[in-house]
A protein has these predicted regions:
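Cell-envelope/ECM-targeting effectors and their regulatory/trafficking segments
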Residues: 1-207
Length: 207
């Protein structure tokens, strides 16, 4: 059974492969910045780490052999689709790797709903670049709430370096007034938040 100790081991293995001398349990900025793209056809220890992470996440790469073949490519492609990127390739990049080497779930968990999971996928697709790839487990929690605020801050034009995912003075001052008939991404985010608060609305429109 996968636990944090296994995830920490995979993170440290990645750091060793990246040449980081002082390894740690975290997937921090140095690990993120040094993490390369790993593409189909690659071989070696980095591929072992990808394959191990996929097995831990419940995706079958069809082998633990250090070869980024069709099995690994297909598994990563399925993982990306579950994250909210249905048309992405099956190659690995640092954003996907960070989410892979984590305990976050990207399939529906007990107690979750398909409506919330769909919103989580949409938030990842539109706003992960302002934060990170977040769970798509169907559960409305603190992480999802933070992602909603990051999305709002991106739409407000707050620079990524200043975005916090928290509801502070700058976010309050820039928050727009919405009126009946408005159609924009702010309305879309309001619809997402409305579903999170237990109301049934169509999230596939921005009106």
């Amino acid at each position: 059974k996968t636990g944090w100790k296994t995830i920490y081991g995979l993170r440290r293995a990645l750091q060793i492969e990246l040449g980081i001398e002082n390894t740690s349990d975290s997937f921090g900025p140095t690990t993120y910045n040094l993490c390369p793209n790993i593409n189909q056809g690659a071989t070696g220890n980095l591929v072992y780490i990808v394959q191990g992470g996929l097995y831990c996440k419940g995706y079958n790469p069809n082998g633990f052999d250090g070869v980024y073949g069709n099995g690994a490519y297909s598994a990563v492609k399925s993982l990306k689709a579950d994250m909210g990127f249905p048309n992405a390739s099956g190659n690995m990049n640092r954003d996907i790797m960070k989410a892979l080497l984590d305990m976050s779930a990207f399939t529906l968990l007990p107690g979750g709903t398909s409506e919330i999971r769909e919103i989580q996928q949409k938030l990842n697709y539109d706003y992960y670049d302002y934060y990170q790839i977040s769970p798509c487990n169907g559960l409305y929690d603190r992480e999802m709430n933070k992602m909603l605020i990051y999305g709002l801050q991106k739409e407000m034009g707050i620079p990524k370096s200043s975005a916090t995912g928290s509801w502070g003075p700058t976010t309050i001052s820039k928050c727009p007034t919405l009126n009946l008939g408005d159609s924009n991404n702010f309305v879309k985010l309001v619809r997402y938040a409305t579903v999170c608060n237990g109301y049934s609305v169509n999230v596939n429109t921005s009106i």
